Amino acid sequence: MSTKIDETITFECETGNYHTFCPISCVSWLYQKIEDSFFLVVGTKTCGYFLQNALGVMIFAEPRYAMAELEEGDISAHLNDYEELKTLCIRIRKDRDPSVIIWIGTCTTEIIKMDLEGMAPKLEYEIGVPILVARANGLDYAFTQGEDTVLAVMAHRCPEQEFPIGESKETKTKTKLFPFPLLKEKKLVEYANHPPLVIFGSLPSNLVSQLDTELRRQFIKVSGWLPAQRYADLPSLGDGVYVCGVNPFLSRTATTLIRRKKCELIVAPFPIGPDGTRAWIERICPVFGIEAQSLEEREERIWESLKDYLDLVRGKSVFFMGDNLLEISLARFLIRCGMIVYEIGIPYMDKRYQAAELALLKDTCIRMCIPIPRIVEKPDNSNQIRRMRELQPDLAITGMAHANPLGARGIGTKWSVEFTFAQIHGFANARDVLELVTRPLRRNENLDNLDRTTLVRNNNEFYTSTPTPR
């Protein structure tokens, strides 16, 4: 007997609040990605405590970020903000000599209306170091959108595309330095003659190399990445340049690239999981008139290598509470692995930027013959917990605040922040995603095998108890 599956995606919006990790945490991975940068977070002691605890980096390690702590004098306007920030930036230039200083605005600077954008142009002219201002406050932005605001601001500083299509800056430079044929050039890949392609999104260097290699196999050359490892290496942007994102939380950056820099956006699913990576490449290739090759076989090999994990997750259920805006991509991948997704909570949803990802989610659900999960934007945690009590999922992917309470109620949990910091992009890293997902499932199965599944408190001490046979 065949059953008809609803093929429409249901969107809902609840309270309008952001129950997420603080967006200033983007400093933790961006300062490592942009090697010659320095991040100055302008906020209160609370922001400082958060960075100290969340990043786990001690001050004496001299990381390339710092706190400009606001005091009562700053808030009551008794102190000159410009002079205070100037003193700090001069000290940063002297001690660390960065190529760029990035000010990160917080909730406090937003509330007291501190004019960081007005001060930065004058100050960067005085000290001779570029200063970018990114508002990453938790009032307006969710967890990973902190990176989005930084990249959107950085896109404004990218140079204009100067070289004719088909002739790169690297080619012209090599011709000037070596006016004779290079023997090594014979070993290089013959790239197709296509317009410049810039990929935006912060990924570790090894992931950048992996995705570059995947596109190189299709004879596509990546002209640059935003952000680059060094500020001076920011890619050239302009009319005729194609851009494509690797993360679903970069809608503001995409809008800036389209409207301000006149780039052409390639709307594609995101390269998370073998299915997403294949779809990402298949969306890029036709834009340049190239037919994708050998992707189906490559994807099948990856799925075959994941068989041990797939046997463990098949038929298990998962509930996304919403935190890092990776929820749609992760849900699509887990559905393809055979899991059942009850609900996808997400802090913010840009349907235009994630259109291709949503289409792939729908196609995946139809292929796996399961209902399309409903998507709840800005979910109310109380309502979610009520729904979880009814559904009893095997796993909840949630923020840190809810992990222990849910675990105490017998629901396996995984911190969503772990997916943010893990390497989950590309063909080769699908195993890492499943390792994160299956860890709590394996732990619960081991407890079941021991018949020790509950905690009992006696005289202020906890003991594991064996359920009474019925």
From Swiss-Prot:
Note on cofactor: Binds 1 [4Fe-4S] cluster per heterodimer. The cluster is bound at the heterodimer interface by residues from both subunits.
UniProt source species: Pinus koraiensis
Gene name linked to the record: chlN
Ligase found in the keyword field: no
Protein name: Light-independent protochlorophyllide reductase subunit N
Family: Belongs to the BchN/ChlN family.
Keywords for this protein: 4Fe-4S, ATP-binding, Chlorophyll biosynthesis, Chloroplast, Iron, Iron-sulfur, Metal-binding, Nucleotide-binding, Oxidoreductase, Photosynthesis, Plastid
Entry-linked InterPro entries: LIPOR_BchN/ChlN (IPR050293), Nase/OxRdtase_comp1 (IPR000510), Protochl_reductN (IPR005970)
Subunit structure as annotated in this protein's UniProt entry: Protochlorophyllide reductase is composed of three subunits; ChlL, ChlN and ChlB. Forms a heterotetramer of two ChlB and two ChlN subunits.
Pathway(s) the chain acts in: Porphyrin-containing compound metabolism; chlorophyll biosynthesis (light-independent)
Compartments, as annotated in UniProt: Plastid, Chloroplast
